[in-house]
């Protein structure tokens, strides 16, 4: 009797992922947190989701050097990069697109329409000249590329759906995460932070509430792994960071209501969170913005 051989389809092959976290890098600024001599930019993560052959990269980095290192990392995976997905419009998550597409010319960069609008704003001459280039002199790529607009909220990867979930205001407007239901993964962008001080400089009491609602929405997906856009290198990607991020926002909102100065807000949050990464960057910028 002849044996029956079953051939696995691409859809039968589970997806996997890997995360690259770039170390924090120094900035150039005179607006320093108390007791510090240098403001650092927080570590940033980029996630490669892959199947048997193809891969999707979620978010890139800021500087030329970071982009080249990220491209080398993707190339070392041996996967065919088809797509770069951008979770939100902050420059530190998309300035490296051009370098990646130079290395992987058959790939395309995509984002939701509202994210594309913010990307254009971040890459405008005014914002580059007033914010990014002074912080990172001679380090920002000369050529910045804007993602194409996604026409639907699903990216196909070897028969698996990568689902865009729009979560509204988190550390900026119109943010998204990427949900991979087949493996219980959420790539959260900056909607969740992993043991790094949150960037709340664009927040007020109303939008801090919106960020908490965004975290509730992510939690409702019941993920088994949540990758933060800014995470302590070496940390795992436990879903517990959803509640940790939510509690940090609650604490910041409460302390913002009981302090009158940036220094007071900064000091009190540092008492509550003495060990989180980069208080002199993200926390100080947040305190200065909320208590000008």
Predicted features and spans:
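Active-site neighborhood of phospho(di)ester-bond hydrolases with catalytic His/Asp-centered motifs
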Residues: 58-60, 82-90, 110-113, 186-189, ...
């Amino acid at each position: 009797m002849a044996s029956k051989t079953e051939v696995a389809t691409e859809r039968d092959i589970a997806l996997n992922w890997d995360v690259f976290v770039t170390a924090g890098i120094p900035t150039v600024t005179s607006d320093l947190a108390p007791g510090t001599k240098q403001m650092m930019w927080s570590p940033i993560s980029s996630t490669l989701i892959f199947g048997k052959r193809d891969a999707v990269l979620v978010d890139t980095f800021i500087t030329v050097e970071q982009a080249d290192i990220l491209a080398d990392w993707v190339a070392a995976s041996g996967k065919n990069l088809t797509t770069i997905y951008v979770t939100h419009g902050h420059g530190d998550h998309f300035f490296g697109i051009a370098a990646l597409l130079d290395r992987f010319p058959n790939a395309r960069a995509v984002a939701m329409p509202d994210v594309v609008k913010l990307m254009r704003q971040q890459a405008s001459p005014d914002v580059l000249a007033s914010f990014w280039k002074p912080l990172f002199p001679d380090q920002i790529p000369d050529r910045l590329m804007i993602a194409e607009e996604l026409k639907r909220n699903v990216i196909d990867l070897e028969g698996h759906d990568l689902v865009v979930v729009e979560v509204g205001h988190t550390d900026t407007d119109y943010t998204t995460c990427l949900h991979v239901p087949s493996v219980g993964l959420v790539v959260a962008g900056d909607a969740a932070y992993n043991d790094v001080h949150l960037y709340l400089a664009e927040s007020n009491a109303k939008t801090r509430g919106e960020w908490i609602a965004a975290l509730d929405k992510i939690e409702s997906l019941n993920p088994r792994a949540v990758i933060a856009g800014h995470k302590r290198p070496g940390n795992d990607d436990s879903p517990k960071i959803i509640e940790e991020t939510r509690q940090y926002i609650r604490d910041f909102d409460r302390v913002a209501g009981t302090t009158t100065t940036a220094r007071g807000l900064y000091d009190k949050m540092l008492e509550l969170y003495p060990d989180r990464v980069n208080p002199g960057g993200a926390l100080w910028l947040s305190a200065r913005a909320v208590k000008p």
